[in-house]
Amino acid sequence: MGILQKFSLENRTAIITGSGRGLGFEIAKAFTEAGAHVWLTGRSAETLEAAVNTLREAGGKADYAAFDITDTAAGGRLVNRIMDEHGHLDILVNNVGARDRRPLAEFSDEDVLDLIRTDLTSSISLSRDAVEAMNKNGYGRIITITSILGYIVKPGDAIYPVAKQGLTGLMRSLAVDYGARGITSNAISPGMFATETNAALAENPDMVAFAKLRVPLERWGQPDEIAGAALFLASDAATFVNGHVLTVDGGMSVRL
């Protein structure tokens, strides 16, 4: 097999959470262009339908399932549906996440649990269901989107880094427990990306200046710049990559 063929996702089926827009959508776009049948998830059926239509118009194979990621039973039903309709689930991208920027003293116990449910335990539950399905075919790729803020912490952002470090631990546990079964587990740790959610920040002159100061590439990342990293980890070009965190931050995390 030639090297370019190893990046093909033909006949692969993937779930990408939080993929109606932003980084998740760009990953979905790359996967469909590489030949995968991608299931997009999120809360808004309207947003997901528009995203799926965009992918289909470009010749991609895509469907969607609208549900709250904290509804773990709904995630399990999606895995079962994919197994019934396709016979195999090959790739899971744990991308969905929320943000609540506050110092710890301002969090109630329930506030903490709400963020942890969305950013951590939902991925644990869906990964559990996914590896059970993948194990039936002896093949799988699990990619978990973490953040450089899992190990470089900003003031007043107490719980988000906790969840992101937890996701790294999940990724490594899956890598150790399931690698011998043909299922690899890796993570992507993004830096500053100019997604729709961050659009106002990315255009703020102070944040533009901050990026020039802190990021060696002197700019924010564009959403499509994460797609190549995800495609690599999902493909047969990464068959011996397992338990790895691939940082995609323009060098921000290595600059003093």
Locate each region found by the language model.
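Conserved glycine-rich cofactor-binding loop
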Residues: T13, G20-G22
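Substrate-binding pocket helix/loop in short-chain dehydrogenase/reductase
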Residues: P103-L104, D111-I116, A211
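Active-site loop immediately N-terminal to the catalytic Tyr-X3-Lys motif
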Residues: A105, I152-A158, A180-R181, E218, ...
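Residue(s) in the substrate-gating loop at a strand-loop-helix junction
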Residues: S147
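Active-site helix of classical SDR
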Residues: S127, A163, M171
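Short C-terminal tail/terminal secondary-structure segment
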Residues: G2-Q5, I152, L231, N242-L256
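Short, small/polar-rich loop/turn modules that mediate ligand/substrate recognition or access, typified
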Residues: G179, T184, V241-G243
